Amino acid sequence: VNWLEESISFDLPSQGEDYLLSRGVSRTLINELRFGWWDQITEPTDKLVLGRYKSMLRKFEGRVIVPIFSPQGRIVGVEARCLEGKHPKSLRLLTTQAQWNPLFVGLSPYAMERIWNGANVWIVEGIFDVTTLQRLLGNSSVVLGTMRASVTRKHLDFLKRTVKGSVFVAYDNDKTGQDSMKGYIDDQGRSRKGVVDKISDLGLSCSPVYYRGGKDPNEIWENGGDSALKKAFSLYV
């Protein structure tokens, strides 16, 4: 067990669980993705944490913790989400080991096992888009969040190495998300390749996902519940 894991309590207080349930996260996913609560007891020893994050660790208190797993199942970073009103709404902490790993939210050991077994992979942005679509799709698919509307070389290498099924990209419905998904022409008139084409270039089957009813999958669920979610993604499910 590393320092970061020791700093997370996986026994969520009621306000943490209530917050996650209100965002549409099922109890099954709360356990599977190992949502936790900041409970730091010892001082960090990791050089990256000491150099970059030590002064902000107290801001993690009172926030729900979203572990960021390596493909081997080790927690290499966290996202800390505020329950209400605090800014910024999310904080991130990465350990030295995170530098050598693809960083996704949603990549639990159980999700990794399903990817190896041939599950389709959906790529979204944030953690609540992960949990919302995982709720809809069930265990035949794994939903991973890149935490911003882009993929890194490490993301692409991971997908090429592990995915046997199809890939679907369902980024946010804003300009940034759609441009990143489909590609765009930049201010200098140069063509910029989108995430769908980058993944297709790996030799994988990759499709863009178009939906209506909200700026992202979680907003659709918040606006209309499971029925609205099912309707929005009926072409793909």
List where the protein language model places each region:
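C-terminal or mid-to-C-terminal helical accessory/interaction module adjacent to the motor/catalytic core
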Residues: P208, A228-V237
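TOPRIM metal-binding catalytic domain and adjacent DNA-binding surface shared by DnaG-type primases
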Residues: V1-I65, F69-Q72, M112-W116, S200, ...
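Acidic beta-strand-to-loop metal/phosphate-binding motif
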Residues: I123, G165-I185, V209-Y210
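Short, aromatic/basic amphipathic alpha-helical patches
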Residues: D179-L202
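RNase H-like polynucleotidyl transferase catalytic core
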Residues: V143-A149, L204-G214
